Amino acid sequence: ANTMDSAYYNQLNTGRANIFYNRATQEKTAPGSTFKMISATAGLEEGYIDAYTTTYCSGSFNTVTPSPKCWIYPGGHGALNVVQSLQHSCNVFYYQLGYNMGIDSNGNYDSDLGTDKLRKYAAMYGLDRKSGVEIPEAAPQISDEYSIQSAIGQGTNNFTVSQLNRYVTAVANSGTVYDLTLIDKTTDAAGNLIKDYSAEVDSTMDEINSSTWDLIHQGMEQMVASSTTFTGLDFSMAGKTGTAQHNELHADHVLFVGYAPAEQPQLSIAVRITYGYNSGYASEIGRDIAKVYFNPETAGELITGSAANLGEGIAGD
């Protein structure tokens, strides 16, 4: 009992499935559009945008060449403010913001100026350091080049799901960055409590204006409200999807970050499906996690064979 055949263990350890590789804490990808709350924070706090600033999306950002595209191209979103930009995940809004943050005192574009501002706010959200979880975790990487692409979560941004979870937790609670923990309590052999554990505060984002949090929360709430994926829930949610490009030979990675209930969050969620094609798949997993958390009796619904219908409720990224 409690033993494993060495040949079988070797097969598991060397197999292509990599079952001993903890993807949640060790696998890193670009965050895609889940990064846009950081870009919005930077833009609002640095004065590049406010609640009334709009950017017109024609489907392509033509200020630079080659011109990066919005996911809706060849269509366009039209004029959007920051709340609508999060709701619709408009890339052009954030291309423009990443460009504007890189304009120097002479009116010239300097990508480093833009990435420095994005890095500042990403670090405030804890993305310049590990999450504190008690198992091995890969070191995060905040993008240091291409401010236009970095503003939509591309560039050289590279994070684990655990790090994205800590970030969205800080979004949900308006600026408290916690160290993650997997340990609830320790007991002795007789079940007597040795120590209770709780997440410890890493840092607080006290300098961020309450109006900034309000706008970001509104955008994430409207993203969920406008998606049929989340229809019929008996609790409110806020969230943001993401699609991270790998290369032309592989499907995109897809992500979802969110929290619930939207008004008084109890739960934060981060989902990534490597090479997952459609962010709707990640969104539905995030939704189902929340459903089971608040209604444990619904767990049986997740094994009804309906996985083939996933991903139909969300367009774009």
Where on the chain are the PLM-derived regions?
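Beta-lactam-recognizing serine transpeptidase/beta-lactamase-like catalytic domain environment
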Residues: 1-33, 38-274, 314-317
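Short, gly/Ser/Thr-rich active-site loops of penicillin-recognizing serine hydrolases
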Residues: 193-195, 200, 285-317
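Short, charged, low-complexity patches
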Residues: 164, 278-287
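Intrinsically disordered, low-complexity acidic/polar segments
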Residues: 266, 278-280, 296
